[in-house]
Every structure is written in C-alpha cells, then in structure tokens.
Amino acid sequence: MKTVYIVAGLFVMLVQGSWQHAPQDTEENARSFPASQTEPLEDPDQINEDKRHSQGTFTSDYSKYLDSRRAQDFVQWLMNTKRNRNNIAKRHDEFERHAEGTFTSDVSSYLEGQAAKEFIAWLVKGRGRRDFPEEVAIAEELGRRHADGSFSDEMNTILDNLATRDFINWLIQTKITDKK
C-alpha cells in the first residue's frame, strides 16, 4: 500500500513540475521572453506570464477545436436529415397534404368541376327550364359547413352565386337571334 502512495506522490510531483517548466519550442513562446532561451529565468513574474500565455493559447486552441467540431456535427446532421428526407418524408407528405387542407381543396375543386360539366351538358341538351329558388339558395348557403367546421356565411360568396344564377336565368330566357 505504501508503494502505491509513493508512486502517486512521484507522479503528482512530476506532473506539477512539467506544468511549471513548459518547453519553448515554438516561435510564439520564444517571442514572449525578453531574454534569450539559454539564459536562466530568475524573475517569478516572467514565469507566471509564460504560464498564463500557454494556458490562454491552450484554451483558445481548444475553443477553436470545439467550434470546428460543432460545425462538423451540424453539417453531418444536415446531411443525414437530407438523406432521410428523400426516403421517409415522401410517404409522410401524402398524409400531410390532408392536414394542410390542400387535399380538401382539391376535392372541392374536383366537385365544382363536375357540377360545371353537368350544368354545361344540361344547357347543351336544352331540357326544360330550371328554376333557382333564391330563398332556398340563401338559406342553403348560410347553413352549409366546410370540412373545418366553419360556416360559409361570407357575403361575397353568396352574392357571387346569386349573380351567377341571375345570369344563367337571363341566358335561358333570352331568345337567340341570327344575324345574317
């Protein structure tokens, strides 16, 4: 047990000694000394100044290393995200469309297109007069709900529908005259 304590004590003294007498290999450390490297240093302030400089250099270098490491990690994360986006997110986009409301909008557009085609076919066939009771239409417009649960009581929509119906009634009732 004594030998372990002795070895630990020698190790601590060795480490402490190496911290106090750092080798001056680089030009930066050599420039910080006013005396030449061969002359012994007798001023304790100069030793402390050297120690502070080497600690600051280590801290600065370590900070630069950590910054570059964070940048590398971030770039790696971006690359992995992009790589995963191509495989997984395409399946997720189909479900996301409905959540965004574009799917509902596409269905509404399709249904409106179908109604327009049916109406044009009805006009071309020229079958009987179709009446549009306006009181029922207004009540129907006010009571209709959208997929998100909100009422469609916007006056612009109602007025546009009424104007369209009036125009269609005018077209149906007007006689076509041929000018030759």
UniProtKB/Swiss-Prot annotation:
Instruction: Extract the ranges annotated as region (Disordered).
Output: 23-59
Return the PROSITE patterns for the record.
Answer: GLUCAGON
Q: Tell me the SMART domains matching this sequence.
A: GLUCA
Q: Kindly state which keywords UniProt assigns to this record, in alphabetical order.
A: Amidation, Cleavage on pair of basic residues, Hormone, Phosphoprotein, Secreted, Signal
Keyword check for Isomerase: no
Where is this chain's protein located in or outside the cell?
Secreted
Question: Any signal peptide, and if so, which residues?
Answer: 1-20
Modified positions (Arginine amide) are 127
Q: Which GO terms describe its biological process?
A: adenylate cyclase-activating G protein-coupled receptor signaling pathway; adenylate cyclase-modulating G protein-coupled receptor signaling pathway; cellular response to glucagon stimulus; gluconeogenesis; glucose homeostasis; negative regulation of apoptotic process; negative regulation of appetite; negative regulation of execution phase of apoptosis
Share the record's PTM remark. Proglucagon is post-translationally processed in a tissue-specific manner in pancreatic A cells and intestinal L cells. In pancreatic A cells, the major bioactive hormone is glucagon cleaved by PCSK2/PC2. In the intestinal L cells PCSK1/PC1 liberates GLP-1, GLP-2, glicentin and oxyntomodulin. GLP-1 is further N-terminally truncated by post-translational processing in the intestinal L cells resulting in GLP-1(7-37) GLP-1-(7-36)amide. The C-terminal amidation is neither important for the metabolism of GLP-1 nor for its effects on the endocrine pancreas.
Query: According to its UniProt record, where is this protein mainly located?
Result: secreted
- What factors induce this protein? Glucagon release is stimulated by hypoglycemia and inhibited by hyperglycemia, insulin, and somatostatin. GLP-1 and GLP-2 are induced in response to nutrient ingestion.
Question: What Gene3D superfamilies does the record tag this protein with?
Answer: 6.10.250.590
Q: Which residues carry this modification: Phosphoserine?
A: 54, 105, 108, 150, 152
Record GO terms (molecular function) = glucagon receptor binding; hormone activity; identical protein binding; receptor ligand activity
Q: Does the keyword Phosphoprotein apply?
A: yes
Expression sites by tissue: Glucagon is secreted in the A cells of the islets of Langerhans. GLP-1, GLP-2, oxyntomodulin and glicentin are secreted from enteroendocrine cells throughout the gastrointestinal tract.
Q: Where is this site: Cleavage?
A: 52-53, 83-84, 91-92, 97-98, 130-131, 145-146
Output a single Gene Ontology CC term carried by this record.
extracellular space
Residues cleaved off as propeptide: 84-89, 131-145
Which is an annotated Pfam family here?
Hormone_2
Q: Which family does it belong to?
A: Belongs to the glucagon family.
Protein's job: Oxyntomodulin significantly reduces food intake.
- This one is known as Pro-glucagon
Task: List the source organism.
Answer: Rattus norvegicus (Rat)
The taxonomic lineage of its organism, from the top, reads:
Eukaryota, Metazoa, Chordata, Craniata, Vertebrata
This protein's gene is called Gcg
